[in-house]
Regions:
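Intrinsic, short, N-terminal disordered tails of RNA polymerase sigma-factor systems
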Residues: 1-7, 97-149, 159-172, 181-283
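C-terminal flanking helix
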Residues: 32, 36, 57, 85, ...
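Sigma70-family region 2
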Residues: 17-18, 42-45, 57-72, 91-93
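Arg/Lys-rich amphipathic alpha helix in sigma70-family domain 2
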Residues: 65-69, 82-100, 188
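Helix-turn-helix DNA-binding helix
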Residues: 49, 175, 179-182
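Amphipathic, Lys/Arg- and hydrophobic-enriched alpha-helical face
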Residues: 28-47, 63, 89, 142
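Structural recognition of an alpha-helix C-terminal capping motif at a helix-to-coil junction
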Residues: 37, 51-58, 71-83
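Short, charged helix-capping/linker segments at alpha-helix termini
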Residues: 2-3, 17-26, 36-55, 172
């Protein structure tokens, strides 16, 4: 059962805080996909996104009693999630930071013709699509964490500037200005280097073997290909408004959304089955 309105959220929250385990489970089920997808965009890999999503959802359910209804519940959750993700230091790219300069040099200097066929009998088109999905999230790691968050909220989640500004504690005007600058930066890079959307030399199909050789793509472990997609309609309950986007950075809006992995779902099934509700609601 999907929770679609603030009134419904309030009803389930009141029940959960009062000790209703079913209500708490309903809240987690309705949040976990949104939290996982936000984590994936911010951190760039499925394993890191899984770990962060678990941390965020635990923060949410252990602080439910502090929600005062001064904003929409989903806005409150986004605020917790973005604050956690902006300061998250345990993910891969926190240890190996990227830049647009590094990414561009890698594209320019890769000797694709010298790499043998490494596809391991997996269709090249499938691997190219996997690489495309992975690249869109990894490319975002070239932005600093706050800029990445601004871009993700505005371009992928399409949040209204008033809501996004509230989440990030900035005015709508300041948010729009920063989002515009960040979009232009991403669009300029895509235009210069990406052959899928711009005039650049990088094409996913041609880069598959190089990506496998450099351990950026594993034919035996295709996270995006094997993930279960969810429909845009299922994510729409988290969006308060839509914004028009008119540059190449809008291409990131095509990114698919996914169900949180089964490991995360199982973690919370076991947690909710074993945890004392008093420990949760009184934390």
């Amino acid at each position: 059962m999907e929770i679609k309105s603030n009134e419904e959220w309030t009803n389930w929250i009141e029940k959960a805080v009062a000790g209703d385990k079913e209500a708490l489970e309903r809240i987690v089920l309705n949040l976990q996909d949104m939290v996982f997808n936000l984590s994936l965009r911010m951190l760039g890999t499925f394993p890191d996104a899984e770990d962060a999503a678990q941390d965020i959802l635990l923060k949410v359910i252990t602080h439910l009693a502090t929600f005062r209804g001064e904003s929409a519940f989903t806005t409150w959750v986004f605020r917790i999630a973005t604050n956690h993700l902006v300061h998250y230091k345990k993910h891969m790219f926190a240890q190996m930071p990227l830049s647009f300069e590094y990414y561009g040099a890698d594209i320019e200097n890769a000797r694709l013709d010298e790499v043998p066929d490494l596809t391991q009998n997996v269709e090249r088109s499938i691997l190219a699509e996997e690489l495309k999905m992975s690249c869109t999230n990894v490319l975002l790691q070239c932005l600093d964490a706050e800029s990445r968050c601004i871009f993700v909220l505005g371009t992928m989640f399409k949040l209204d500037s008033r809501i996004a500004g509230e989440i990030l504690d900035m005015t709508p005007e300041a948010y729009r200005k920063r989002l515009s600058r960040i979009r232009r930066k991403v669009a300029d890079f895509l235009s210069a280097y990406c052959g899928e959307y711009g005039e650049g030399q990088c094409h996913c199909m041609k880069r598959v073997d190089y990506a496998i050789q450099s351990h950026r793509l594993n034919p035996a472990a295709l996270d995006y290909t094997t993930a279960t997609e969810i429909t845009p309609e299922q994510m729409r309950q988290f969006k308060n408004a839509m914004e028009e986007i008119d540059d190449l950075s809008a291409r990131f809006a095509f990114c698919k959304t996914y169900q949180s992995p089964e490991r995360t779902r199982q973690f919370f099934r076991e947690f909710l089955a074993s945890a004392s509700l008093s420990a949760v609601t009184n934390a």
